[in-house]
């Protein structure tokens, strides 16, 4: 587990990035640029995972909303929730280029989620698999406030620490793409960081127990078994919903 996102002093949005943060961000920009160009044997696993996430987010976000996604990748999740006005932010130029090509009806901007300021508010803000990957989770969450109204809902999903070792094993076996250093955060960690950023956690759902694309079995485990104790403790990801504190 890396602790950089929790250990160093959080810097207010808008301040210049430190050299370490710049290097960290550049490493990720290169990684995701490369990721956007690859199509290898592990793609079916990722496609299955992303499809299930899209189902979950469609359940939580009604169509026709104003939606902002930070770390939007190719824009697939943003498009899946069918926003009336959708904006995606990503630090990877290659990802943004792909998103613009795939979904010309949406708006995509290359930028850093720690400091982006769009001068607009949204009904929903999505941070999917983002807090695991960013330099400073607290700064990221504090920066969301400028895009929130009192009724805005922030939706995050984050990998469970239970899956850290299985993930490393899958990487060694070539089943998934090797990741850069991650923030393996517990739900309680994210809740505390949300509170520090002036957000209140209002919903937690544990999702995806069977991340392998197998007919019927995947549906059974991921829609039913994962909701039952103690199997929910083994879920791959947690989906959290938060709102601004008054």
Language model: regions and residue ranges:
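A short glycine-rich, Lys/Arg-flanked "PGG" loop and its adjoining helix->strand segment in the class I
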Residues: 138-153
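Acceptor-substrate binding/catalytic loop of class I
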Residues: 172-189
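Class I SAM-dependent methyltransferase SAM/SAH-binding core
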Residues: 73-114
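Conserved class I S-adenosyl-L-methionine
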Residues: 2-62, 64-73, 155-177, 215
């Amino acid at each position: 587990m890396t602790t950089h996102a929790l250990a160093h002093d959080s810097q207010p949005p808008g301040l210049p990035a430190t050299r370490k943060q710049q290097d960290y961000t550049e490493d990720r920009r290169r990684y995701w640029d490369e990721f956007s160009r690859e199509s290898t044997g592990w793609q079916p696993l990722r496609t299955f995972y992303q499809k299930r996430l899209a189902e979950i987010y469609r359940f939580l976000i009604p169509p026709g909303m104003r939606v902002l996604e930070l770390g939007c990748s190719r824009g697939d999740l943003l498009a899946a929730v069918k926003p009336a006005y959708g904006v995606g932010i990503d630090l990877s130029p290659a990802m943004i280029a792909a998103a613009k090509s795939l979904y010309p009806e949406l708006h995509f901007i290359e930028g850093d989620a720690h400091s982006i300021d769009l001068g607009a508010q949204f009904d929903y803000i999505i941070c999917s698999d983002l807090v695991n990957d960013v330099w400073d989770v607290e700064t990221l969450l504090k920066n969301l406030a400028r895009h929130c109204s009192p009724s805005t809902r922030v939706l995050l999903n984050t990998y469970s620490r239970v899956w850290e070792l299985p993930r490393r094993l899958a990487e060694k076996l070539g089943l998934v793409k090797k990741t850069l250093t991650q923030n393996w955060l517990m739900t309680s960690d994210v809740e505390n960081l949300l509170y520090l950023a002036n957000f209140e956690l209002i919903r937690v759902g544990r999702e995806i127990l069977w991340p392998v694309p197998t007919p019927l079995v995947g549906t059974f485990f991921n829609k039913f078994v994962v909701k039952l104790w103690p199997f929910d403790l083994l879920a791959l990801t947690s989906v959290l919903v938060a709102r601004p504190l008054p």
